[in-house]
Amino acid sequence: MKTHYFLLVMLFFLFSQMELGAGILTSLGRRTDQYRCLQNGGFCLRSSCPSHTKLQGTCKPDKPNCCRS
């Protein structure tokens, strides 16, 4: 019975969020901003977008710009 409680506690700590984004299951099923940018025909640049393109958002976590023509 102690083994069951131990496993239950370990699972609780494994899947709980100690702080924002620290949980293991938080990113499952989500697409990254960079992936969404590229899928929508954009590209990521660390500098500002060229004049013939439009800013669509960011490509986190580094936060470069997502530009699209």
UniProtKB/Swiss-Prot annotation:
Positions of disulphide bridges: C37-C66, C44-C59, C49-C67
Lineage, uppermost ranks: Eukaryota, Metazoa, Chordata, Craniata, Vertebrata
GO MF term (any one): identical protein binding
Pfam short name (any one): Defensin_beta
Keyword Ubl conjugation: no
BP GO terms, sorted: antimicrobial humoral immune response mediated by antimicrobial peptide; calcium-mediated signaling; defense response to bacterium; defense response to Gram-negative bacterium; defense response to Gram-positive bacterium; innate immune response; innate immune response in mucosa; positive regulation of flagellated sperm motility involved in capacitation
Family designation: Belongs to the beta-defensin family.
Subcellular location: Secreted; Membrane
Described function: Has bactericidal activity. May act as a ligand for C-C chemokine receptor CCR6. Positively regulates the sperm motility and bactericidal activity in a CCR6-dependent manner. Binds to CCR6 and triggers Ca2+ mobilization in the sperm which is important for its motility.
Keywords from the UniProt entry: Antibiotic, Antimicrobial, Defensin, Disulfide bond, Membrane, Secreted, Signal
Keyword Kinase: no
Subunit structure: Monomer. Homodimer.
Protein's organism: Rattus norvegicus
Main location: secreted
Record-given protein name: Beta-defensin 1
Propeptide residue range(s): 22-32
InterPro entries referenced in this protein's UniProt entry, alphabetically: Defensin_beta-like
Annotated Gene Ontology cellular component terms: extracellular space; membrane; microvesicle; sperm midpiece
Domain of life: Eukaryota
Expression (tissue specificity): Highly expressed in kidney.
Signal peptide per UniProt: 1-21
